[in-house]
Every structure is written in structure tokens, then in C-alpha cells.
Amino acid sequence: MAFQLTPLRVALVAGEPSGDLLGASLLGGLHARLPASSRYYGIGGPRMSAVEFDAHWPMEKLAVRGYVEALKHIPEILRIRGELKRQLLAEPPDAFVGIDAPDFNFGLEQALRGAGIPTIHFVCPSIWAWRGGRIKKIVKAVDHMLCLFPFEPELLEKAGVAATFVGHPLADEIPLEPDTHGARIALGLPGGGPVIAVLPGSRRSEIELIGPTFFDAMELMQQREPGVRFVVPAATPALRALLQPLVDAHPSLSVTLTEGRAQVAMTAADAILVKSGTVTLEAALLKKPMVISYKVPWLTGQIMRRQGYLPYVGLPNILAGRFVVPELLQHFATPDALADATLTQLRDDANRRALADIFTDMHLALRQNTAQRAAEAVAHVIDSRKPR
């Protein structure tokens, strides 16, 4: 790093919990790689704030899911983006890192890049999964892309965007062999007997849409597999309060409702019923059979269906390039279908062994010391812009 008279300043924006995780990992690497006097600020969540990050706005302001659902929040989101843009243009940082949240970050990155501020984007949008458009935005907005998956840099470099594969921090964090017995002890679950983890989402809207269906499926599973126990982790106290009435409405269920501890809950499980998202990758890294599902409002679903061209939405299937675990989406996500598919995943030992091999290969491919690799790439971009 060239000699620096004033502290380096790196602005970062994360818009949802998965971005907060990535941001915290990156910040850990930056603290080790850049001068100790460097400052980090912008928009982030609690994990980023815990590693010396100054959050000018809380991440929750941007955490809105779905096309239709976002409409009512657009004025405030645009106001925040406009104010942040004015601040960053008035006092330019040495680099800007947008962490996922492409709808928010790309417009901001394009404006900053136009003003000569180096722009880095962490998490390549799914240009390989969705039709058209976004690659053009990336070319205009991004100086360097940090990619979680190994096949992404080649796609970007063909379009003229510099990119680095950095792996996924979850692959660094999660052990290659999960301690199922230890996780059951931590949750107060019996060591024997089947356990299914059920994760209906990390947002109120997700739980309201699919939570009742998941609990009805749990009721059917317990009827068909009487010894089964369920563990349902709630991401926050507010979401636990939202889930509690569903637990109360199914008094015969053997269910443990936890606050946080999603990874422990999945580690304790023999099979997982999970709403699509980053958590499906976490389940794969834990080597667990699973069923992936989601429900979104009808119009949002229609828009997503028309934009997508991959036949799958779950990260385990995307990374494998084929269906290795079942997906039941929208109107296919009925209690009966979910119960049947999840119990099949629970009972099929040959499938369990095959998935363990597939998921171990994924784990090894993604285990790249992400914090160090990502921080090194950011430092290289900053250093390449500094006068010698």
C-alpha cells in the first residue's frame, strides 16, 4: 500500500442479513490488510457494526423483498440513496464496496464511478440465472466484482469487468464434518430419533406467506413419522413472536422454537425443510438432505418466472448444475407435497450418502479464506488508484 498521509476511508453498503454476514467477513479482512487508522462507514447491520463499522443508516431500511412489496418503500429508499450519494460525492472515499443489494447499489456505484471513485461490488448478481439486462448495468457501475462462486469471473471478464473469485465465508466458518450430536445437546434435544429443522424465512412477509403451510406440513409429517421432532429457529425476537401462534395452533407437534441459532438447528437435524435463499447453501455446507420451497405474492411470482431461465432456484442445485434436492415452489408447495418430499429426504439413506459427497465437494470448492482474498482484492483496487 502506498504511503498515506490521511486515513483511508472505505464506504460499504449492505442491504440484508446475508450481506451483513459478508460485510463483517470483509471488514475482518480489511482490518488485517489496511492501515489501522482506516475508517469504514455506510449502511450495514449488527454484524458489521460489531467490527468497527459506522452505520449511518441501519440495514433494515433497505431489507425489502419482492417487486410489488418494494413499491411502498421506494420513496424512503431513494431518499437514503440520494443522501448517501451526496455525502460520498462531497467527501469521496478511497473506495466504495456495494455488498449485494444490486437494485440499490448499482445506481449509486454508477454515480460514484463517474466521479472517479473506485467501485467494488461484493456478490455477483445471478447473471447466469436470470434473463438479460444486469450485465450492462454491471459494466457501467463496477470496477471490480468479488465473486462467491468459481464460474462467475469468466462470465464477467467476457463482458469486460474485472473479477476475483473469493469463495464464500460460510465455507470457511462451517466445519467439514458437522457435530450433530453436540448441536442436539446444545438445543436440549434427545440424542436419538429423527429431527427435522424447519426454516420458513427471515422476514415477516416470508413467514406470513409460507409459515402456515410449513406448519401444516409438519403436522402431516408427525402423523406419518410419529417419532419425529422439529426445531424451528426464529431470526429475531419479533419473528419468534410471529411464529409462536403457529406453534400454539398445532399443540400436538413436538417442536422446539429457538431464537437465532439457525446453524445449530440445522446441524442438529437429519433433514431440513427450508425457504429458498442463502440458508440453503448453509444447509448444503452442513451436508443435510433438504427440501427447498418458497411462496411469494402472485404478481411477484409471475415477474420472477418470466425473468428466470434456470430450472432451479436453490443454491445447492445451481452449484451442482442439476437437481440434487427437490424444490417445491408457489402452488406446488402444498402441505402434503412438502411432507412427502421431506420425509423422503429423511428416510433415504443412499440419497443422504450421495448428497454428503456432493456437498463436501461444494464445501471444498468454496473454502477459499474469503475474508483475506476479498480484502486483498479491495486493497489492490485502492492501491492501483493511488499516485506513486
Curated annotation (Swiss-Prot):
Pathway: Bacterial outer membrane biogenesis; LPS lipid A biosynthesis. It catalyses: a lipid X + a UDP-2-N,3-O-bis[(3R)-3-hydroxyacyl]-alpha-D-glucosamine = a lipid A disaccharide + UDP + H(+). The keyword Lipid metabolism applies. GO terms for molecular function: lipid-A-disaccharide synthase activity; phospholipid binding. GO terms for biological process: lipid A biosynthetic process. InterPro entries: Glyco_trans_19 (IPR003835). GO terms for cellular component: membrane. It is an enzyme of class 2 (transferase). Its EC number is 2.4.1.182. The keyword Cytoplasm does not apply. PANTHER family: LIPID-A-DISACCHARIDE SYNTHASE (PTHR30372), LIPID-A-DISACCHARIDE SYNTHASE, MITOCHONDRIAL-RELATED (PTHR30372:SF4). Belongs to the LpxB family. Condensation of UDP-2,3-diacylglucosamine and 2,3-diacylglucosamine-1-phosphate to form lipid A disaccharide, a precursor of lipid A, a phosphorylated glycolipid that anchors the lipopolysaccharide to the outer membrane of the cell. This is Lipid-A-disaccharide synthase. It comes from Burkholderia mallei (strain ATCC 23344). The gene is lpxB.
